[in-house]
């Protein structure tokens, strides 16, 4: 199983717009062969000293895929190309970590 943690920082004030585009694209991703889960997450407010907040402009996408091949097909899909095209002008940065269990 492949896990992905994508940390996405929107331009100031643009996070909600990016999350709306994410939500519109999510059903197509969940329908892909090999997609186990695909979810956007934000900070839990006021959680305390244990938390390192992402911040008001940042969210993470937590993904699980059956295989590396399924993840590669996801990256090559037309709906992800469109999602990337529409969100790119709204983003300050993104960091993608592709992981496997040890």
Q: Model segments located where?
A:
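Generic structural signal for secondary-structure transition and capping sites
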Residues: 27-30, 34, 70, 92-96
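Absolute protein N-terminus
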Residues: 1-2, 102
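Short, well-ordered beta-strand segments in beta-rich or mixed alpha/beta enzyme
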Residues: 2-9, 39-75
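Short amphipathic alpha-helical segments
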Residues: 14-40, 79-87
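Glycine-rich beta-strand-turn "strand-cap" elements at beta-sheet edges
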Residues: 39-57, 82-102
């Amino acid at each position: 199983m492949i896990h992905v943690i994508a940390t996405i920082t929107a331009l100031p004030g643009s996070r909600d717009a990016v999350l709306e585009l994410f939500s519109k694209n999510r059903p197509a991703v969940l329908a892909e062969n090999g997609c186990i889960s695909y979810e956007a997450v934000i900070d839990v407010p006021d959680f305390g000293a244990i938390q390192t907040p992402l911040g008001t402009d940042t969210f993470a996408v937590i993904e699980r895929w059956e295989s590396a091949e399924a993840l590669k097909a996801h990256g090559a899909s037309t709906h992800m190309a469109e999602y990337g095209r529409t969100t790119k002008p709204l983003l300050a940065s993104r960091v993608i970590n592709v992981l496997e269990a040890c």
